[in-house]
Amino acid sequence: MKNFVTTLAAGHLALALLAGAAHAGTLTLYTSQPEADATKTVEAFKAANPGVEVEIFRSGTSDLLTKLAAEFAAGAPQPDVLLIADAVSMELLKKDNRLLAYPEADVEGLAPDSYDAERTYFGSKLITTGIAYNSAAAEKPESWADLVKPAYKDGVVMPSPLYSGAAAYMMSGVALDPALGWEFYTGLKDNGTIAVRGNGAVLKAVAGGEKPYGVLVDFMALNAKAQGSPIEFVFPAEGVSAVTEPVAILSSAKNPEDGRRFVDFILSDAGQKLARDMGYLPAKASAGRPDWLPEGVEIKLMPADIKAVTERIEADKAGFAELFGG
């Protein structure tokens, strides 16, 4: 009987170890990347890390964070890692002690302002928001101010900051900009601009001719143009807002080990070149530029104060919902 009990206990231990090993090989990722890009990212990560399986939940940043907040409230957060649009969302999570610091992460070659000084999140790329317009549009916009002119009446579409993290970051950044301010958004509303669910819907509307002008992230417009879509893109004269699509490990991660591997991959030369090949501007300059950005062309960025944006973004979302509807 003693031998049987010992054998049974050993069997249970072996099963427990096997279950632990299987669990350690599954990584849960929540991301706001477009579906095709999320698939490419995960497949490249898995190729570099054999044996690791990845479960993905993909949605707009705002929807994703709403889901995550509900999981926190229930005491059952699911993701191990996040790859979402903007640093402001990460700052809010960090403030609530939801992020796990990774001090050993290799940040060589990254701009100092692209990652958290305490190394809880790390920018993976630079995504700017500018103006897209259909090739057949009557006007050729050059500035944000153009979009509130009578010639653009009822012709502009933009992503809702209630869904898109990049749009939310731009909204509060513009509100803080003395040259534009919140008046820019009231001007858009008065000029008949409509807000749609996300950047993908903006691209569809502009490329399809439903609306001639759109507020849109750079890579979507320029990649579509490269594929033959009748769309043009301009970096407005006043400058553009930019998000860094940061990656982070949750403090509640069930699989932090593979979470660190995921961060390592995103920041690696291979991960950065993958971002470039998908049409993004990588966080590491050494990874090169996407085809749509020639050498020597510099992008003017709007001044950004992440902490100031973080402090006002929820109030700005409420103001936007009141102005444009939820």
List where the protein language model places each region:
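Short, polar/charged alpha-helical segment
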Residues: 28, 32-55, 224
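A bilobed periplasmic-binding-protein/Venus flytrap-type ligand-binding module shared by bacterial periplasmic
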Residues: 130-137, 172, 244-255, 274
